[in-house]
Amino acid sequence: MDISNTTMERGMQRRTELLLGSDNLEKIQKARVLIFGVGGVGSWCAECLVRSGVRNITIVDSDRICITNCNRQLMATSKTVGQVKVEALKDRLLEINPNATVTCLQKIYEAETADSFEMEKYDYIVDAIDSLKDKADLILRATALPKHITFVSSMGAALRRDPFMVRKGEFWKIKGDPLARALRNKFKRAKTFPSRKFLCVYSEENPMKNMGVNKAFDTDSADYDASGEQQLVEQWSSSKAQINGSLCQITAIFGMSIAGIIVNHIVEQR
């Protein structure tokens, strides 16, 4: 069916506008969102935001899609393996709303690149990266931005299987999450702390132990994980020696919960 972009957007937002009202829909459409990491959490967050009406979104990730991404990452399919993650996700988002402005940045967030992202230009910043060092740096920088810029962070989504244990909470009050604990310990050792409170999505479920073996290291081929993706590993290091299992039923809820925090915050603003 041949539908104009304007007609498509107007039609797709009827249910959103019916629930939230035209004024709130307009606020959502004007919001500028920056997402660091578009893997199992960030990809679902991005789609949920665009479907909810967000028109201006920047997605950041350095990796290409590999086979193992297909169990949990939105844009990862048999046809997209090998493609740049942010480009594949952009294609998906523009199919949903061709009027959206989706900026792709195929680069790593780290201390050396942080200034290049111009975070002060955005209304909302989402942390969906796994590297402990880079995550800590992003938290410190994002919470030091002006208070009108809202920062939301994802804690550990791997090694869980119960979707009903996913919660939101203030970073310093999170219990039972090893990644949050590792971050807090890192801040305490460095005696450098986030400048303000911020919300996180996390799970109250005790992390499981991997019940299987990493086939990439148990066979003749390591192509499964050849993309060099930032993956949650033992102690959140950059080593590929141990990769933790994860499920879409958890990572997707993390991403959609972050999107929900953002949409609700927009609606509640006066």
Named regions from a protein language model:
Residues L105-A114:
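Conserved SAM/SAH-binding loop
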Residues M1-L34:
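N-terminal charged helix/coil linker that caps or initiates catalytic domains
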Residues D2-T6, E120-Y124, I129-D137, I149-F151, ...:
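Glycine-rich phosphate/adenylate-binding loop
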Residues T68-M75, L159-E170:
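Acidic/polar active-site rim loop that often engages polyanionic ligands
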Residues V54, I59-N97:
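Glycine-rich phosphate-binding loop and adjoining beta1-alpha1-beta2 segment
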Residues R51-N56, K147-H148:
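Conserved S-adenosyl-L-methionine
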Residues V41:
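Hydrophobic/small residue at the entry helix of a nucleotide-binding pocket
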Residues I35-G37, V60:
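Conserved N-terminal Rossmann-fold NAD(P)-binding element of oxidoreductases
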